[in-house]
Regions:
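The catalytic Nudix box helix
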Residues: 33-65, 104
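Conserved hydrophobic "DFG−1" position in protein kinase catalytic cores
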Residues: 11-12, 19, 85-87, 102
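Active-site-adjacent beta-strand/loop module that shapes the phosphate/pyrophosphate-binding cleft
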Residues: 59, 69-91, 101
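Generic C-terminal helix-cap and adjacent flexible tail
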Residues: 1, 125-130
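Conserved N-terminal beta-strand and adjoining loop/helix that marks the start
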Residues: 1-17
């Protein structure tokens, strides 16, 4: 089975988390944390900064690795490294996504997340209660 490794940004701002609605592919319309594939010679943090700049025209600072999760889709196995991030500069501008929403911890389950993101959401909801 094909293996895909990605990074995802859990962008935290004013007590809320940024969710983006996928604008392409099999999962168009579903929600995810923004991010993408790690390119050759790139660290996870470098990939995350690049992907957020490309997708949302923002500069973020990865603060810490929140979790790494694995999920088996029918076509591939996904490894997703999720980082808590803070905004350094900019506001979300949609270049690849249909929409973006800032969700309070109690609102995290209010959108239809991609299957791989659901476990992250459960962990994040618990983390936000601390």
């Amino acid at each position: 089975m094909k293996h895909v490794e990605i990074v995802a940004a859990i962008i935290h701002h004013e007590g809320k988390f940024l969710a983006t609605q996928r604008g392409y592919g099999d999962f168009k319309g579903m929600w995810e944390f923004p991010g993408g594939k790690i390119e050759c010679e790139e660290t996870q943090q470098e990939a995350l900064i690049r992907e957020i700049r490309e997708e949302l025209c923002m500069k973020v600072e990865p603060h810490q690795l929140f979790c790494t999760t694995e999920y088996d889709y029918p076509q591939f196995r996904l490894t997703m490294h999720c980082y808590l991030c803070y905004i350094v500069e900019g506001t979300p501008q949609l270049t690849e996504h249909l929409a973006a929403r800032w969700l309070a911890p109690k609102e995290l389950h209010s959108v239809e997340w991609l299957p791989a993101d659901i476990g992250v959401i459960d962990k994040l909801a618990q983390y936000a209660k601390l």
